[in-house]
């Protein structure tokens, strides 16, 4: 499985990536320290596999592996190319799921691209850029399909209708993953490689000098819980 770490610059993506993978990727206090994705592979221990190894006395044991991709920070306007946005967005399309890292700590020594720490604003910024990018991709696909759909091709018509529903969802500011679809429709949606159709895990980066229950951290986490529920899967 491939997981991509996304977020604004300087939110702690590379730090989290290094903590998980022990890869030693560069982490610095300035935007766009990362340009090309850093890649790390982590094995997932499974006690069931250990039992089977003993039962059958196998010579080789291979755990499931997860590939983590530390993707460069996105900024407002990324869908229009700001901050090398188009290049970074293409990297996100290649992963299977997303880890969205959100900065919830206030530290004047760590630069914030927006000049202040506001987790909810930052989440909305990233989500909107991903939605705008998906809209652009979807509209190009619809332009190619419309003639075939109007000619009476049943498959093209079926797919065009699904894309129409997806477009309405995106134009309403909602990610594709929150759209209720059938299993058959989901197979087609996956073929579109839309970023907002991927499942997301939100990672809250709190201050290293206080606990998650401190007033500042707990209020940020509560606010994040509320807004991220709006962007969760329809299921």
Located regions from the model:
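Conserved G1/Walker A P-loop phosphate-binding module
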Residues: 1-82, 86-107
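C-terminal-of-GTPase-core extension/linker across diverse P-loop GTPases
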Residues: 2-6, 17, 142-211, 223, ...
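Active-site-proximal flexible loops/turns
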Residues: 25, 77, 129, 141, ...
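Helical mechanochemical/support elements of P-loop NTPase systems and associated helical scaffolds
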Residues: 31, 35, 48, 61-67, ...
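Conserved Switch II/interswitch segment of TRAFAC-class P-loop GTPases
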Residues: 40-43, 72-79, 93-132, 136, ...
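Residue-level detector of transmembrane insertion/anchoring sites
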Residues: 60, 195, 211, 215-218
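Alpha-helix boundary/capping motif
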Residues: 213, 218, 222, 226-229
């Amino acid at each position: 499985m491939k997981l991509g770490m996304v977020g604004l610059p300087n939110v702690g993506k590379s730090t989290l990536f290094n903590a998980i993978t022990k890869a030693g990727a560069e982490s610095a206090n300035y935007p766009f320290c990362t340009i090309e994705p850093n890649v790390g592979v982590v094995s997932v221990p499974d006690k069931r596999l250990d039992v089977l190894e003993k039962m059958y006395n196998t010579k080789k044991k291979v755990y499931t592996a997860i590939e983590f991709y530390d993707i460069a920070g996105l900024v407002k306007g990324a869908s229009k190319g700001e901050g090398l946005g188009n290049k970074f967005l293409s990297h996100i399309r290649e992963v299977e799921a997303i880890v969205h890292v959100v900065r919830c700590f206030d530290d004047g020594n760590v630069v914030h691209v927006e000049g202040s720490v506001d987790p909810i604003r930052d989440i909305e910024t990233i989500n909107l850029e991903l939605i705008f990018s998906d809209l652009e991709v979807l509209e190009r696909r619809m332009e190619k399909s419309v003639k075939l759909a109007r000619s009476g091709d049943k498959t093209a018509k079926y797919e065009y209708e699904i894309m129409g529903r997806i477009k309405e969802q995106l134009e309403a500011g909602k990610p594709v993953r929150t759209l209720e679809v059938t299993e058959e429709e989901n197979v087609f949606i996956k073929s579109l490689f839309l970023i907002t159709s991927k499942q997301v895990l939100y990672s809250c980066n709190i201050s290293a000098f206080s606990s998650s229950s401190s007033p500042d951290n707990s209020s940020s986490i509560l606010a994040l819980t509320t807004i991220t529920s709006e962007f969760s899967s329809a299921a």
